[in-house]
Amino acid sequence: MSKIIQQLEQEQLRTDIPAFAQGDTVRVQVRVKEGGKERLQAFEGIVIAKRNRGLHSAFTVRKISNGEGVERVFQTHSPLIHSVELKRRGDVRRAKLYYLRNLSGKAARIKEKLN
């Protein structure tokens, strides 16, 4: 039974998503339906958390919009995600960057990975 489930999940996994980690800046293109039209909406920010659970993997992206912090959780293998573009690699030592919620301005910057 579980082999059948694993096989079905394996078929649904997306391979076009680049490898990224916490602290990286990414641009996620999301398919949005408005009325009868479908368009792409970009959401660019810092990945503050990742949850690796196979087909149920997710990641959280945080950005500052009009002085207000906005976080959005994306399902990694969702068909609503058109693409994920890696903009910049960040050098961090934590798995979850929730402390960025309390920081603002220059204090919330993340050092760029140089290699």
Curated annotation (Swiss-Prot):
Q: Give the source's domain of life in one word.
A: Bacteria
Where are the membrane-spanning stretches?
none
Q: Biological process GO terms, please?
A: translation
Recall the GO molecular function terms of this protein's record.
Answer: structural constituent of ribosome
Q: Which InterPro entries match?
A: Ribosomal_bL19, Ribosomal_bL19_CS, Ribosomal_bL19_sf, Translation_prot_SH3-like_sf
Q: Does the keyword Glycoprotein apply?
A: no
This protein's UniProt keywords? Ribonucleoprotein, Ribosomal protein
Q: GO cellular-component terms in the record?
A: cytosolic large ribosomal subunit
Entries under HAMAP family matching the protein = Ribosomal_bL19
The entry's function note states: This protein is located at the 30S-50S ribosomal subunit interface and may play a role in the structure and function of the aminoacyl-tRNA binding site.
Q: Give the family from UniProt.
A: Belongs to the bacterial ribosomal protein bL19 family.
Protein name as it appears in the record: Large ribosomal subunit protein bL19
Species annotation? Aeromonas hydrophila subsp. hydrophila (strain ATCC 7966 / DSM 30187 / BCRC 13018 / CCUG 14551 / JCM 1027 / KCTC 2358 / NCIMB 9240 / NCTC 8049)
Q: Upper lineage ranks?
A: Bacteria, Pseudomonadati, Pseudomonadota, Gammaproteobacteria, Aeromonadales
